[in-house]
Design a protein with these regions (language model features):
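Secretory targeting and sorting signals
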Residues: 2-31
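Short glycine/serine- and acidic-residue-enriched loop/turn motifs that recur at repeat junctions
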Residues: 58-76, 109-127, 160-177, 210-228, ...
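A short beta-strand motif characteristic of beta-propeller blades
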Residues: 78-80, 129-130, 179-181, 230-232, ...
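An edge-strand/N-cap motif at the start of beta-rich repeat modules
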Residues: 30-62, 71, 75-78, 94, ...
Length: 387
């Protein structure tokens, strides 16, 4: 597709510099939000949900991905238009974001050139629009140019760009509205949308992936693309969590061990090497105490069952959080970080939700995505403005 965004150009540029519409009135961001319930790091922006159920975002906003009815970049949280309560989750993608309400409805905003907002148009929106024909949903994940959700009945549905089969409907036809992933019509537990691939956990706990497989990111011990789900090698049951990234994927198995596969140029698989792998390899030194693992583009992080965060891979902007800018092929401890309950990985930054429900971020901050009311990158955690 000639007009598709060039990811290498996006990477190079940053490394140099780094249907239905809501009609509720915009709410001002809380001056001093006390607590959050979740946080999601996107490529150049971040969003959270407060304990009041309000959605707020910060960082780059050229396409309206902050959702505040503007295209003004912000280095501190701004309120998403109309979503001031009753939201339980949020997902930040490349240049768009999506939220899930307590009633199971999905709203998306931002870049929409390929229909990734799901409102049956290709019109960008700086405020939330409802996803068309989706029904009730239990989870949503915004990827690069596509989005996926799991319905309350466990069907996996995706929409947006499909040039590499990342929608999983056994075609490469893009869709402005949700389509059902081939064979995943009920019982699915989770979905993770990435750059040009997607992964899900089935009712039986198997990890299945689809889309581009040029670096083995589908994990089926091949490098063959697939327009429909294939089973990840060795992960046929009891998979607890999965995270699809740029060209790599990670998961937590039934023994609470972190496994990763795919592209490994910066050590983002965490196996103390830079060797790509088309099937899962264990993350060096983590053992069986992993609660969740997240990967994005060039680095990955894990949250242990004791609430500690460890990261590995690319670290030029301090995104590993170990108070250095040295890359690491194996996990390093995040510097001076409170006990955490969630970790989320963006392009060149990382964020956590602490046990005290504060949001802290670190890494590249050229667009204000760290949220501390500055554009200064940091190699150790800082509180998001207002916490």
């Amino acid at each position: 597709m000639a007009s598709r965004l060039s990811w290498p150009r996006v990477v190079a540029g940053l490394l140099v510099a780094m249907g239905s519409v809501l009609v509720m009135p915009a709410a001002a961001a809380d001056a001093a939000p006390s607590k959050a319930i979740t946080v999601s790091a996107g490529y150049y922006h971040t969003c959270d949900v407060t304990t009041k159920g309000a959605v707020r975002c910060w960082g780059y906003n050229a396409y309206g991905q902050l959702g505040d009815n503007s295209t003004t970049t912000s280095n501190k949280p701004v309120a998403v238009y109309g979503l001031s309560s009753k939201v339980k989750n949020v997902s930040s993608g490349y240049m768009h974001s999506c939220a899930l309400t307590t009633k199971g409805k999905v709203w998306c905003w931002g870049y929409n050139a390929y229909g990734q907002l799901g409102d049956n148009t290709t019109t960008n929106s700086s405020k939330p629009v409802a996803v068309a024909g989706l029904g009730k949903v239990k989870s949503v994940d915004a990827g690069y140019l596509h989005t996926c959700a799991v319905t309350t009945k466990g069907a996996v549905k995706c929409w947006g760009y499909n040039g590499q089969g990342q929608l999983g409907d056994n075609s490469t036809t893009s869709s402005l509205t949700p389509v059902t992933v081939y064979g995943l019509t009920k019982g699915a537990k989770a979905v993770s949308a990435a750059y040009t691939n997607t992964c899900a956990i089935t009712a039986k706990g198997a990890a299945r992936c689809w889309g581009s497989n040029v670096y083995g990111q589908l994990g089926d011990n091949s490098t063959t693309n697939s327009n429909k789900p294939v089973t990840v090698y060795g992960l046929t049951k009891n998979v607890k969590q999965i995270s699809a990234g740029y060209y790599s994927t990670c998961a937590v198995n039934g023994k609470n061990k972190a496994l990763c596969w795919g592209y490994n140029s910066q050590g983002q698989l965490g196996d103390n090497s830079t060797t790509n792998s088309p099937k899962p390899v264990g993350v060096y030194g983590l053992g069986s105490g992993v609660k969740s693992v997240k990967t994005a583009v060039l680095h990955s992080c894990a949250l242990t069952t004791k609430g500690k965060v460890k990261c590995w891979g690319y670290n030029v902007y301090g995104e590993l959080g170990d108070n250095s800018t040295t890359n690491s092929l194996k996990p390093v401890n995040v510097y001076n970080l409170d006990k955490s309950t969630k970790v989320t990985v963006g392009y060149l930054h990382t964020c956590v939700l602490t046990a005290k429900k504060a949001v802290k971020c670190w890494g590249c901050n050229g667009s204000g995505q760290v949220g501390d009311n500055s554009t200064t990158s940091t190699s150790q955690p800082v509180k998001v403005y207002g916490f």
